[in-house]
Amino acid sequence: CSWRGHRPDMEKVLTLIAPRGALSPDHLAKAAAALRAAGGEAGAMQPLSEAEAADLPFGGLPLDVADRAVRDALAGQPVDAIAQDVIGRRKRLLIADMDSTMVTSETLDELAGEAGLKEEISAITRRAMNGELDFEGALRERVGMLKGLALEALERTWATTELMPGAEELVATMRAHGARCALVSGGFTFFTGRVAEKLGFHEHHSNTLLHEAGRLTGQVGDPILGRNAKLVTLKRLAGEEGLDLAETLAVGDGANDLDMLGAAGLGVAFKAKPIVAAAARARVDHADLRALLFAQGYRAEAFRRVV
């Protein structure tokens, strides 16, 4: 690896990321001290973005031990820490969830608001995303409750849907460096198509809301894209690109993302449900989606935005 300050014995890197302006020298000092206290070596800090992100090269510790040591040392601070090998940290395939990941809301819950059912449907969504309910059954149940809703409600829901901060930079920067970018969601094509177009994803895969005479029928097209389908899509796209799974990045927040996150080279639980954050190898709880670029070693000045 050619990055500045790299030493052969520092074959791993810890990336510290915080909301803009919130990363302090004290955070970096505590992280380095935690690595040394755990029995590792820490090198010189490499800034990625002023008061937002920095790389800390290290060696002599397994990744999970380093992660845990630094998280414990920074507990209660608004700082995310991601430890990984230096070699191969830049990924060539991005697979991203949509709801509460690429957009700030759960689009089905917002659509339910148009039918006056947001509270009831949100409760089911919450349980499904926490892994308490079967995803497919929960999806059919929620869509069934929307039978008869006019299609104009979809347009109104889209008009108020907001992109997650950092989503534009993530997709545009990875695309500019040759990565294939796919949006894979248990949500619906009406929304994934629009999000994919707005952010510049190469493709999108999701479920279809069936409708007739301008109204929802309360049914979902088969087959349903759920937890296993996300994993299958990750493996299929990696195969099409001739990539090892180690060269892939997946990001999501719900229980139906767990298999995909576990299989990707870097699987990131983004502001995720507790069951997901606990199981994922990497997690982002405080920063925005720019964190996924910093984790790959990109400096802020190299970020792109959708043109």
Question: Residue spans of the language-model regions?
Answer:
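C-terminal cap/substrate-recognition subdomain and adjoining C-terminal extension
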Residues: 148, 155-307
